């Protein structure tokens, strides 16, 4: 039993021995590697796999399952490392990039291979060789783009193939030829393009009983998006329509702003759909080729994974030329697709477009400050509650506007924005709606409702859209007869639109020509054998159409009329230039109508036989209208022919592009408008040739005008705007309200006239004057303002009277105002308020200029004719001169009143429809031309009287005339030369006597004259200025009112007159005046300052340039460095002693020398008196000082009369007997004596000039007006004798002095004593006594 027991125990052990290896394999620890896998494959797991079909039992020893998923394998494991019995290999979720040839060679038992979710991009041919038993292959979610038939070699038993989720977009035919057992395939990708390139797949699948997975969905084109490929029909797989690419990128894709010299690369990537796929580059639509010298580097295109094509373009050195659009275009047989990017190249100094606000019919846009070369964008104003979706109103649409490289805004693009006006927006909706025979009549009735308010249209696009709709409705007239009446009503309503809007619509889209052309073709489209007559009446249009037989035609006469209540001729309905008020639909009896009769009856518009009606137009068609028919249309079987008549109440729908008639119709340079109704006659389908007899037309005028011309509307082509021409039309007769004409053409006929209220030409308004006007006006303004500024800045130094100063400045200012406003605003008719302001300003300035000339002529005439009686002792002083206010009230107030009344009555009197801004003709007669005629008459009378006065006794007897008028420059110089030889003391006596007799025989107030020009010269200058201004005004008026050659001639004459006027005013009043030239020189400082210890300057003799007879006044106190307190002394107006005379001369000479601060050059010697002769009492020019000086000179004249009667002795007695206190005299007394002192304040020739260290700080007192007038008087013979006696007395009392004479003057002369005294005064304040020892000072 023991032995048997042992045998029984050994039997199970023998049975377990064969299973021991399997148990060891299953129980082996994992630490030594994956279970059942070689130690070299650490990331894989191996396990046994039960064969299919076995429900239990032990797995077969040769079947292995190897799982290598998620192990980051870069490539499949070597087949030799895997178990020989491997039937399933899972390699998903790794990083395998490619499959080499023979990657799985040796795995002959492999039945399932899973390679999904890798990054496989290339599969080499033969990659699956050796897998003869493979039944399932999963290559989904990789990056495979190239698949060929060689790819799947060695898979004869493959049943299921999954290649979905890759990047291919199409498959080549025969790609599955190496898979004979294939039953199911899934090839859906995000780029799958179901087009003609996949058309082979559907029949191939049907023939092979291949099932396309339901997950195989189309991605492109968009029409088949998300549809299963297996459910499509073969016809749906086509390559028609726009090219759609699954990939098309351009880098950079957004606008780039770069600087000159930068480097910019471009890269373009697109779908590769075949060998014909190409990428081309364009710059501003021009092809781009590689050019290394120009900095353009273009690389060859590269193809990636048989799916993408890439091209690179590099700009290595960017210049300004690179600005614009750069475009990448993908081209193939199916079509082209492009991507663009804008490049803006900035210069080193880039400019900006200013911020600007634009308001138009699309909205209100505020464009910000934008860099030059940049296109700015603004969001459109959207209407979210718009019931009808518009193509241009989609969300996100924008308006664009480009700022050019010069920093100027270009016109913006607002086409993607909605209209702000409700009517325009609705009419635009009508245009976008599709029209067919079922809805045409409904849309037409709805559109007519909107056109009933055509008078309130405010946008030209309203007319454009209605015209487009009328053209669309014309195509359905043959089917819907009711459309004829609706179309005529809409055209009639559009004639109520403002004429300016009609003109703009015609210019924009030829809208008016479209409407007229549609109406002319209605008869031929609507008439048929069942409808042989059409008659439609409307407010402004009437239509009559007949279907006639040419062989039975005997002539036709039609008259267009209306009821008298609807439009009496005097009311002139619809005249151009006037906005008609909105009108409701008029009653039937107020509409235009036709009345036609056969034959040729006599019809007169003046005696129309229908009661309570007025005939507006008539046309008579001759019986021979169809006599020129071709033989094909001759009897015995005459075809039907359409004859249509139209009448338009006015010519609002007939606008040529320039709104003017052609030269043949109106003559050269004429502006004409339609003054009658327009009547049309035309045929359709008749082949009418040249007429053998003319068409007789009679038309009633609804507007006044001149020079009527018969014309017909010539339409050059279907798309042409057309225009009026008179070729073939002749005017037979013209009465005040009716014109008769004959025409050899069928068409639209009217009478053109020069209308008094011609509508303004919008396109030409503000276009400007002839170019010659502007530079000549600028020259005139330059001369006038130079004169004005000179006289204002140098008021005190220019020797003109107060009245003369005011009159000259006002005259220059008003001439400048007239010329400037004329040149700058006469053509600004586009802006109503500006045009009215220009007209009012021109009206005022023209009248005021002529009135100032008249005032100046009156003052000059008064100077020549009025003389005051010689004053006697005890006579009261003369009255103060009248103020200048009266002249301002006359020359400025009268024009202001006239212009104010004219504007208050009707402000529109200053805005006619003429092409310039001026008064309407009738109001201008009473408001301008008649006042101008009166002003000219009075002015010319003054001119004539003044001229006769100069040629009469005044010219023969100077003593009885205006003795105070100075001679001209040449005469003054000669007079000074004659007196210079009479000795130095002659000047003193002459000055005394001339001053004393200044009031004797004075012709007028002393301030009323000119110190340099004689009355004759002044009168000649005024007359010249007057007539040059009239010539300039007349030529300027003709230059804007005429056309063509007369306009050019008048513009040139205006330029000549304006230039001559400006140069004359400047030359006469500035350049030729010595005092003005001296003031100019005084404004320029000397080149180098005087030396600190310069030798004294010699004083010129008083008779050389500062002669008391012909000399100029002393320098002003402004030149003194001591200011207003520089001279504490004052001399009485009558107590002129020899001490005062000497001290006055020395002090003033010293002040003149010391006040300059530096010596003058020799060329300015003797011109010191030119500086500020009129500056009275410390630089103040007050009228009160003038009056005091006037009275002082009058009182001094009484004392000087004694010297005049007593000769030299009386003068000496007067000088030596009277005494006065220097310190106690009032200031006015000093002014009176200093103005009359001989040679006061002048440099004395031959004597040394005191240096600033030697002279005193006192200021020279200027001469008064009376003193200057007295110095300009000629010395009498007694004065000359007295001068000799005084000279002897001066030599007798002189002392021998040792003072050096720098200019070589002889010692012991006239002013030797004065020189000595001046040296003493330098230290004693002009109070040292040295010459007259008998003088006493109180």
From Swiss-Prot:
Name the GO terms of the biological process aspect.
canonical Wnt signaling pathway; cell surface receptor signaling pathway; central nervous system development; endothelial cell migration; G protein-coupled receptor signaling pathway; negative regulation of vascular endothelial growth factor signaling pathway; positive regulation of canonical Wnt signaling pathway; positive regulation of endothelial cell migration
User: Where is the sequence biased in composition, kind Pro residues?
Assistant: 578-587, 1088-1098
Q: Which residues carry this modification: Phosphoserine?
A: 1107
Q: Where is this region: GPS?
A: 710-759
The compartments listed are: Cell membrane; Cell projection, Filopodium
Post-translationally, this protein is described as follows, namely: Glycosylated. Proteolytically cleaved into two subunits, an extracellular subunit and a seven-transmembrane subunit. Cleaved by thrombin (F2) and MMP1. Also cleaved by MMP9, with lower efficiency. Presence of the protein disulfide-isomerase P4HB at the cell surface is additionally required for shedding of the extracellular subunit, suggesting that the subunits are linked by disulfide bonds. Shedding is enhanced by the growth factor FGF2 and may promote cell survival during angiogenesis.
Residue limits of the LRRCT domain?
190-240
- Renumbered to this chain, the Polar residues biased-composition regions fall at 1223-1237
- Report TM segments: 772-792, 808-828, 833-853, 887-907, 925-945, 1020-1040, 1048-1068
Give ranges for the Extracellular compartment: 34-771, 829-832, 908-924, 1041-1047
The UniProt entry annotates the motif RGD at 362-364
Spans of the LRR repeats are 82-106, 107-130, 131-154, 156-178
Q: In which tissues is it expressed?
A: Expressed in endothelial cells (at protein level). Abundantly expressed in heart, placenta, ovary, small intestine, and colon.
Which chain positions lie within coiled-coil regions?
none
- Family under the similarity heading: Belongs to the G-protein coupled receptor 2 family. Adhesion G-protein coupled receptor (ADGR) subfamily.
Instruction: Give a short account of what the protein does.
Output: Endothelial receptor which functions together with RECK to enable brain endothelial cells to selectively respond to Wnt7 signals (WNT7A or WNT7B). Plays a key role in Wnt7-specific responses, such as endothelial cell sprouting and migration in the forebrain and neural tube, and establishment of the blood-brain barrier. Acts as a Wnt7-specific coactivator of canonical Wnt signaling: required to deliver RECK-bound Wnt7 to frizzled by assembling a higher-order RECK-ADGRA2-Fzd-LRP5-LRP6 complex.
Q: What is this protein called?
A: Adhesion G protein-coupled receptor A2
User: Which organism does this record belong to?
Assistant: Homo sapiens
The gene it comes from is ADGRA2
């Amino acid at each position: 039993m023991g032995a048997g027991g042992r045998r029984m125990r050994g039997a199970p052990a023998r049975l377990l021995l064969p299973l021991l290896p399997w148990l060891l394999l299953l129980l082996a620890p994992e630490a030594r590697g994956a279970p059942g896998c070689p130690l070299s494959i650490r990331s894989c797991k191996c396990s046994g796999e039960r064969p299919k079909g076995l429900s239990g039992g032990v797995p077969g020893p040769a079947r292995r399952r190897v799982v290598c998923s998620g192990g980051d394998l870069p490539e499949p494991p070597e087949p030799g490392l895997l178990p020989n019995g491997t039937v399933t290999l899972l390699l998903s979720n790794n990083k395998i990039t490619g499959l080499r040839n023979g990657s799985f060679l040796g795995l002959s038992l492999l039945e399932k291979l899973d390679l999904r979710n890798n990054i496989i991009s290339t599969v080499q041919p033969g990659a699956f060789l050796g897998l003869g038993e493979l039944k399932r292959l999963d290559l989904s979610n990789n990056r495979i783009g190239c698949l060929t038939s060689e790819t799947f070699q060695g898979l004869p038993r493959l049943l299921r193939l999954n290649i979905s989720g890759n990047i291919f977009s199409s498959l080549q035919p025969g790609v599955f030829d190496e898979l004979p057992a294939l039953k199911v395939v899934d090839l859906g990708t995000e780029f799958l393009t179901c087009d003609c390139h996949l058309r082979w797949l559907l029949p191939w699948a049907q023939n092979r009983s291949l099932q396309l997975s339901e997950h195989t969905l189309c991605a492109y084109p968009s029409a088949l998006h998300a549809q299963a490929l297996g459910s499509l029909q073969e016809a749906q797989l086509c390559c028609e329509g726009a090219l759609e690419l699954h990939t098309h990128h351009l880098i950079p894709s957004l606008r780039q702003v770069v600087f000159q010299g930068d480097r910019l690369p471009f890269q373009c990537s697109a779908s590769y759909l075949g060998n014909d796929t190409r990428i081309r580059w364009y710059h501003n639509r021009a092809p781009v080729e590689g050019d290394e010298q120009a900095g353009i580097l273009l690389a060859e295109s590269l193809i990636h994974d048989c799916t993408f094509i890439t091209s690179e373009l590099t700009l290595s050195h960017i210049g300004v030329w690179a600005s614009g659009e750069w475009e990448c275009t993908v081209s193939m047989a199916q079509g082209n697709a492009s991507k663009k990017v804008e490049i803006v190249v900035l210069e080193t100094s880039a400019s900006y477009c200013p911020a600007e606000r634009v308001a138009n019919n699309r909205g209100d846009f505020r464009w910000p400050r934008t860099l030059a070369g940049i296109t700015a964008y603004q969001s459109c104003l959207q209407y979210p509650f718009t019931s009808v979706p518009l193509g241009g109103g989609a969300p996100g649409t924008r308006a664009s506007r480009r700022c050019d490289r010069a920093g100027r805004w270009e016109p913006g693009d607002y086409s993607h924005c909605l209209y702000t006006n409700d009517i325009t927006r609705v009419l635009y909706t009508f245009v976008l709606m599709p029209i067919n025979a079922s809805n045409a009549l409904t849309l037409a009735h709805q559109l007519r409702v909107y056109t009933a308010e055509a008078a309130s249209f405010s946008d030209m696009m309203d007319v454009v859209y209605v015209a487009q709709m009328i053209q669309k409705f014309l195509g359905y007239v043959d089917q819907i007869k009711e459309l004829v009446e609706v179309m005529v009503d809409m055209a009639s309503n559009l004639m109520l639109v403002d004429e300016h809007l009609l003109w703009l619509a015609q210019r924009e889209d030829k809208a008016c020509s479209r409407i007229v052309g549609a109406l002319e073709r209605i008869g031929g489209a609507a008439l048929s054998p069942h409808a042989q007559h059409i008659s439609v009446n409307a407010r402004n249009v009437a239509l009559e159409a007949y279907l006639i037989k040419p062989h039975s035609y005997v002539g036709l006469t039609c008259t267009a009329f209306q009821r008298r209540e609807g439009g009496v001729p005097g009311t002139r309905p619809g005249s151009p230039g006037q906005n008609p008020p909105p009108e409701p639909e008029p009653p039937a009896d107020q509409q235009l109508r036709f009345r036609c009769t056969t034959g040729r009856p006599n019809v007169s518009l003046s005696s129309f036989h229908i009661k309570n009606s007025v005939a507006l137009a008539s046309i008579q068609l001759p019986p021979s209208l169809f006599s020129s028919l071709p033989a094909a249309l001759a009897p015995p079987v005459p075809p039907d022919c359409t004859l249509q008549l139209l009448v338009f109440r006015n010519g609002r729908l007939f606008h040529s592009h320039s709104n003017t008639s052609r030269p043949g119709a109106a003559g050269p340079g004429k502006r004409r408008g339609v003054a009658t109704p327009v009547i049309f006659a035309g045929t359709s389908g008749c082949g009418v040739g040249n007429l053998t007899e003319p068409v007789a037309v009679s038309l009633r005028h609804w507007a006044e005008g001149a020079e009527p011309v018969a014309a017909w509307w010539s339409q050059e082509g279907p798309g042409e705007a057309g225009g009026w021409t008179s070729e073939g039309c002749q005017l037979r007769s013209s009465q005040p309200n009716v014109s008769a004409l004959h025409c050899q053409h069928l068409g639209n006929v009217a009478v053109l006239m020069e209308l008094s209220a011609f509508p303004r030409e919008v396109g030409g308004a503000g276009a400007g004057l002839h170019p010659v006007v502007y530079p000549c006006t600028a020259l005139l303004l330059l001369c006038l303002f130079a004169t004005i500024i000179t006289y204002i800045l140098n008021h005190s130094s220019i020797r003109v009277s107060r009245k003369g100063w005011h009159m000259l400045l006002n005259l220059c200012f008003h001439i400048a105002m007239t010329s400037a406003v004329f040149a700058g605003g006469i053509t600004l008719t586009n802006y109503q308020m500006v045009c009215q302001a220009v007209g009012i300003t021109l009206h005022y300035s023209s009248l005021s200029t002529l009135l100032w000339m008249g005032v100046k002529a009156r003052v000059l005439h008064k100077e020549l004719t009025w003389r005051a009686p010689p004053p006697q002792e005890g006579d009261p002083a003369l009255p103060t001169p009248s103020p200048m206010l009266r002249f301002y009230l006359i020359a400025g107030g009268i024009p202001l009143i006239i212009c104010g009344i004219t504007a208050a009555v009707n402000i529109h009197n200053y805005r006619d429809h003429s092409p310039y801004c001026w008064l309407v003709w009738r109001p201008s007669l009473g408001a301008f031309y008649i006042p101008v005629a009166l002003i000219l008459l009075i002015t010319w009378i003054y001119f004539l009287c003044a001229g006769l006065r100069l040629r009469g006794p005044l010219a023969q007897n100077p003593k009885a005339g205006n003795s105070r008028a100075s001679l001209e420059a040449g005469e003054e110089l000669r007079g000074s030369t004659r007196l210079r030889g009479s000795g130095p003391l002659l000047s003193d006596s002459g000055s005394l006597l001339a001053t004393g007799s200044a009031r004797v025989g004075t012709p007028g107030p002393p301030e009323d004259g000119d110190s340099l020009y004689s009355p004759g010269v002044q009168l000649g200058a005024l007359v010249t200025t007057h007539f040059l201004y009239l010539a300039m005004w007349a030529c300027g008026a003709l230059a804007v009112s005429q056309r063509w050659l007369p306009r050019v001639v008048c513009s040139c004459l205006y330029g000549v007159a304006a230039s001559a006027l400006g140069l004359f005013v400047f030359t006469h009043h500035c350049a030729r005046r010595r005092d003005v030239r001296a003031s100019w020189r005084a404004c320029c400082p000397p080149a180098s300052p005087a030396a600190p210890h310069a030798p004294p300057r010699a004083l010129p003799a008083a008779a050389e340039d500062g002669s008391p007879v012909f000399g100029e006044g002393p320098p002003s106190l402004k030149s003194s460095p001591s200011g207003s307190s520089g001279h504490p002394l004052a001399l009485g107006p009558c107590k002129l002693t020899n001490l005062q005379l000497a001290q006055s001369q020395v002090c003033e000479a010293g002040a003149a020398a010391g006040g300059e601060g530096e010596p003058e050059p020799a060329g300015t010697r003797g011109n010191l008196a030119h500086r500020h002769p009129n500056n009275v009492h410390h630089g103040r020019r007050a009228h009160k000082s003038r009056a005091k000086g006037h009275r002082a000179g009058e009182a001094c004249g009484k004392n000087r009369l004694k010297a005049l009667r007593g000769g030299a002795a009386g003068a000496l007695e007067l000088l030596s007997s009277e005494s006065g206190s220097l310190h106690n005299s009032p200031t006015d007394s000093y002014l009176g004596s200093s103005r009359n002192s001989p040679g006061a304040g002048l440099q004395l020739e031959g004597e040394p000039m005191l240096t600033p260290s030697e002279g005193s700080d006192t200021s020279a007192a200027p001469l008064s007006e009376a003193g200057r007038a007295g110095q300009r008087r000629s010395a009498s013979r007694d004065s000359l004798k007295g001068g000799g006696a005084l000279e002897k007395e001066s030599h007798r009392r002189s002392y021998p002095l040792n003072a050096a004479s720098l200019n070589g003057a002889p010692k012991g002369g006239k002013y030797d004593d004065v020189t000595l005294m001046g040296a003493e005064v330098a230290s004693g304040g002009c109070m040292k006594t040295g010459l007259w020892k008998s003088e006493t000072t109180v």
